[in-house]
Amino acid sequence: VVXXQTLXDXRGIYGDQGSIGPXXIXGLQGDRDAD
């Protein structure tokens, strides 16, 4: 899923690839954090 996350989320900028920040660093995990 693309666009699962955005810069504004402050959690990640790679969307479904993963989250970079206080959330987690993993594909599926990062995608959930965007929610």
Swiss-Prot record:
It comes from the Eukaryota. Residues 1-35 are annotated as: Disordered. This is Unknown protein 14 from 2D-PAGE.
